[in-house]
């Protein structure tokens, strides 16, 4: 129609084409769909008939399965990389965001007809030399009764304490008390800055040798590495079990080492990757100095870039545009994260036939993924725009008082604590409201806890920071509750409760006749029906935009309308059931339950 309007102009469109449009919309397959079809200027005004809306709401009510599923993305295969914890480290609060966002994005793609592979990319290789060395070096010094997983975390704490002290430039009087305590227990010879720096150098050198042996396939190192990885994976499963989340594949980055190495070797032979020589570095430095002279770069920016250039000399890099480069192998020939990430692109494309590679990782990795995707294109791993690559990033957890980013050590480093706090909060609030037993209360508390965490993460811009008051988790969970997850769950529970009451009382639901003809919907009923009917479109839109907030906001809209509607429009009155209100309630229950399922939230029997 816009083409006809543009071609003939408004006068011709109004005189010739608009009457034809009005006629088509008033008969044939559209007969009974619209109660009013009129023309005003160049516009056709349509009003859906009450009978058609009631029929359509009935189809929503009777839908078998997850309402809203479609085949809009049936020609696409998504590999979604999310959660991605580090072996030998404790899960921190940020892993909640990655896990929830990635899992629900996967559900959205799946509900829209795509083939989806959910991949937990375990960081099980990079930096593991420190773990292997620490496990042997400090084996006799761990506290009695400390389990294997806590030993791995303790090794990481030792390493970080040593790095902070050695790099801090202060003698013992200026050390953080926690760091000083760790070093006193495990490295008593470290008493001043000089001894700390010497110990750090030895530990790093020994760890590098361990990693080189692991990378070369040394049997003893590989066996210990496998055992320690298994310990970490078992601890991660406790977190995933509590969230009720599973993956199609749990794959360590080590899987991609050989593929990444082969890609780099091929690129060197083809010239798409080069060894970053001092000559190349000097050329880049000259270019940077020219920018400083031209006033387009500050002296501080130059110094930072110059340090990065000096660090990269001797490394294998993929030259990028804008004078940037992507380091894929260290100067000493050792692999790095980038080596394995390049291998992952190739394997995921070949093994899964991926048309889309989605990485759900925090915003601190934006530069890395930008360069990874550009390098993959240069290396021929992306051809004709396929696979599509997307980094879905999210904001930091920040201190509720200072607004500063929380580190793993300072924040809720044990994710189980945050989930347990949410569960306890809701269980306490439900204990005097649910007449059922402890199992029913626990199920409802779990649903509300997960629902509040999910909606808090998804309702707003994913890039926004999330405030955590680590001194008062109850306050944080209370804020999460206000995000709306509990409100949507309440609407679904209320709708299902009304339906159950009709069934339990053996009440009959009167016939609607020919699709509800003769019943006049009020404006709120018509709006509710429209929102229910457009839910499938919102699911697809959320999937296409890789933005769960599109669906979450629509769910909140439906819940808001229904919670207002049922309080004024009784479904049951004097043992008589209003059939239209009953069907709208059925449709609401089905739609919200389905949408909540996509958001990984179960609807409890009562709250």
List each language-model region with its residue ranges:
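Non-catalytic interaction-recognition regions
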Residues: 1-54, 65, 72-607
């Amino acid at each position: 129609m816009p083409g006809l309007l543009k071609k003939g102009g408004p006068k011709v469109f109004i005189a010739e084409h608009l009457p034809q449009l009005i006629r088509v919309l008033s008969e044939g397959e559209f007969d009974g769909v619209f109660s009013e079809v009129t023309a005003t200027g160049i516009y056709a005004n349509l009003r859906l008939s009450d009978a058609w809306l009631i029929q359509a709401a009935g189809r929503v009510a009777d839908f078998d399965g997850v309402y809203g599923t479609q085949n809009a993305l049936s020609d696409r295969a998504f590999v979604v990389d999310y959660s991605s914890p580090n072996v030998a480290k404790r899960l921190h609060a940020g892993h909640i965001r990655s896990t929830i966002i990635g899992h629900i994005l996967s559900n959205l793609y799946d509900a829209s007809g795509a083939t989806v592979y959910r991949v937990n990319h375990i960081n099980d290789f990079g930096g593991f030399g420190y773990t292997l060395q620490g496990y042997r070096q400090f084996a006799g010094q761990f506290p009695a009764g400390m389990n294997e997983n806590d030993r791995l975390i303790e090794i990481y704490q030792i390493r970080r304490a040593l790095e902070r002290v050695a790099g801090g430039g202060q003698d013992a009087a200026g050390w953080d008390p926690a760091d000083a305590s760790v070093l006193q227990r495990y490295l008593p010879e470290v008493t001043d800055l000089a001894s700390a720096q010497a110990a750090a150098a030895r530990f790093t050198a020994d760890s590098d040798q361990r990693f080189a042996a692991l990378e070369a396939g040394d049997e003893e190192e590989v066996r210990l590495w496998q055992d320690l990885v298994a310990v970490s994976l078992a601890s991660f499963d406790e977190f995933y079990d509590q969230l009720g989340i599973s993956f199609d594949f749990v794959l360590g980055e080590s899987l991609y080492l050989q593929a990444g190495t082969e890609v780099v070797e091929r690129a060197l032979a083809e010239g798409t990757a080069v060894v970053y020589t001092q000559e190349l570095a000097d050329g880049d430095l000259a270019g940077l100095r020219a920018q400083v002279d031209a006033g387009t770069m500050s002296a501080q920016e130059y110094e930072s870039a110059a340090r990065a250039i000096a660090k990269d000399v001797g490394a294998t890099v993929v030259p990028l545009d804008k004078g940037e480069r992507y380091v894929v192998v260290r100067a000493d020939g050792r692999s790095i994260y980038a080596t394995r990430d390049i291998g992952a692109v190739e394997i995921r494309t070949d093994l899964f036939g991926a048309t889309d590679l989605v990485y759900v990782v925090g915003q601190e990795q934006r530069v890395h993924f930008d360069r990874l995707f550009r390098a993959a294109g240069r290396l021929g791993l992306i051809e004709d725009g396929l696979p599509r690559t997307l980094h879905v990033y999210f904001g930091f957890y920040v201190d509720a008082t200072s607004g500063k980013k929380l580190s793993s050590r300072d924040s809720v480093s044990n994710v189980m604590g945050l989930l347990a706090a949410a569960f306890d909060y809701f269980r306490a609030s439900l204990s005097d409201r649910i007449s059922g037993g402890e199992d029913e209360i626990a199920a409802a508390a779990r649903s509300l806890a997960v629902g509040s965490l999910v909606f808090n993460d998804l309702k707003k811009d994913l890039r926004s920071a999330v405030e955590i008051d680590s001194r008062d988790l109850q306050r944080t969970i209370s804020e999460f509750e206000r995000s709306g997850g509990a409100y949507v769950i309440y609407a679904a529970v209320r709708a299902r409760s009304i339906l159950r009451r009709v069934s339990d009382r053996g009440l009959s639901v009167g016939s609607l006749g020919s699709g509800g003809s003769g019943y006049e919907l009020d404006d709120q009923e018509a709006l509710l029906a429209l929102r229910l009917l457009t839910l499938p479109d919102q699911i697809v839109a959320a999937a296409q935009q890789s933005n769960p907030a599109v669906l979450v906001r629509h769910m909140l809209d439906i819940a808001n309308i229904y919670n207002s509607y049922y309080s004024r429009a009784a479904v049951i009155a004097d043992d008589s059931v209003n059939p239209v209100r009953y069907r709208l309630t059925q449709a609401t229950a089905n739609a919200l339950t389905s949408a909540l399922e996509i958001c990984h939230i179960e609807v409890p029997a009562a709250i």
